[in-house]
Amino acid sequence: MAEFETTFADLGLKAPILEALTDLGYEKPSPIQAECIPHLLDGRDVLGMAQTGSGKTAAFSLPLLNNIDPELRAPQILVLAPTRELAVQVAEAMTEFSKHMRGVNVVALYGGQRYDVQLRALRQGPQIVVGTPGRLLDHLKRGTLDLSKLSGLVLDEADEMLRMGFIEDVETIMAQIPEGHQTALFSATMPEAIRRITRRFMKEPQEVRIQSSVTTRPDISQSYWTAYGMRKNEALVRFLEAEDFDAAIIFVRTKNATLEVAEALERNGYNSAALNGDMNQALREQALERLKDGRLDILIATDVAARGLDVERISLVVNYDIPMDSESYVHRIGRTGRAGRAGRALLFVENRERRLLRNIERTMKLTIPEVELPNAELLSKRRLEKFAAKVQQQLESSDLDQYRALLAKIHATAEGEELDVETLAAALLKMAQGERSLIVPPVAPMRPRREFRDRDDSFDRRGDRNDRGPRGDREDRPKRERRDVGDMELYRIEVGRDDGVEVRHIVGAIANEGDISSRYIGNIKLFASHSTIELPKGMPGEVLQHFTRTRILNKPMNMQLLGDAQPRTERRGGGERREGGRGFGGERREGGRGFGGERREGGRGEGRRFSGERREGRAPGRDDASAPRRDDSAGRRRFGGDA
């Protein structure tokens, strides 16, 4: 078809944008880009119907950026997105597309981010504003967002905003925008409520319908794991140990993550390397050659760095960070299952990312099964199997005569008694394994396992709750059982009241940097120059090292373990306890981070755990009729085992 032969230069985009596209590896426009860009460049409204992953972000970003005035320090493009994750993704994409346009700034506004940070960004006069409806409406009410110079408005994933209950906020925002602007609306489906918006606010929009080109890959076994409790690095090591693979590629979202994951795998004995955009071509080619000839087994890469990668050895793909669109997911898992071989693909999904999983399933028209984290029994079995295979290989391929002679010398004890052969073999086996035991001890989960629910994904409202009135009486809510102090350890951090630190700062840093639900943070006491905090026992050494470097109000915590937490009755004064804190599993702290990991100004906000799971008293979720149904009764599969 003709549109596939079109280049971005043919569409009439300016040189700085074309240069950015070249840097990003874009070669030719996708169907939706080829159709939408000319209409938007000409100033027409566009109604786009396309699935997530079709390239619609570039379809609206490129032409609208092309038409802005970089000299005008005022919002000229406003993009509405249903979730903070999508808002951040769009803002990052538009920043990349405009990186060669001097003077162009992009800001993302969403619930959970501090207002002072957003206000400083708005005072700098950004030309592009991307945000969620609740926070954008709040800025409009406060008078901190001026849309008088707006020339372009985008509603991204409008059907998601409808399903999540934001459509009234969207209409309120659109009603406050001056006339004469250009509007682009994108939606995978077109329910009547969305049609009503198009009739009310859009001027003879050009309709663009694109069918998804994403197809299933029956030769690739796909599964996902709900990331909870254990840090993703530890979980990754367990999955790699449980799976038989020739070579693997692990996809992450950022350049820093490629290095961090590679270091974690190297510490656990895996021959791995990072592959990111900061590497020069020689280093990249060297890593690929090592992967091809077997000197390297695992690559950790970003999407951009892995473009064009084709290595037949790759039998496992791990999506360590879930991709933001379905097309990227298909491209990632397509790195395995090459040359007629079968492949496996594993996806890590955090609770707040379940919408992205649903998008992938909906686009690919399949249900991806969930797997359990490999347990100690399975890992022990794998280690024994691998060790037995190594022993068998030595028996079949090596000359063992000199070792038999050596064994005969140590076979007898100093007293002249014969040493039991099995005992001697067991001792040698233990020595051969070194510090890596063949028997894996069971690890207690960080928090109770919860089922992955296909409920309404309205987590973005967490940060906008203070705009929606009081929540009412909480007296009838069930109280949580307090965690046993015996499960906690006491840590000291070198920040205190004299540094301006508050309890909420500590809770936020621990929850965010340690990937720990704030309900698992115990008692906090503030002193003049330091503070103490109770955390669950069994913190991995790498997490403690990370906390040592983590900064609170620009001062490193320098965390160190003091010992087991003491019973409450033995503690007396001396410091400031966390405001409103109920310790482990209790209600959240005043002015602190909610259990969804967001910081709020003032009010309590909607109560969610850091993982995105609501506390008791949550409203029931709505069914998502368009997504494939899950059969929860079938249970989860064991990774690496039978389906």
UniProtKB/Swiss-Prot annotation:
A motif (Q motif) lies at residues 6-34. It catalyses: ATP + H2O = ADP + phosphate + H(+). ATP binds at A50, Q51, T52, G53, S54, G55, K56, T57. It is an enzyme of class 3 (hydrolase). Residues 448-482, 567-643 have a biased composition (Basic and acidic residues). Belongs to the DEAD box helicase family. DeaD/CsdA subfamily. This is ATP-dependent RNA helicase DeaD. It comes from Klebsiella pneumoniae. The gene is deaD.
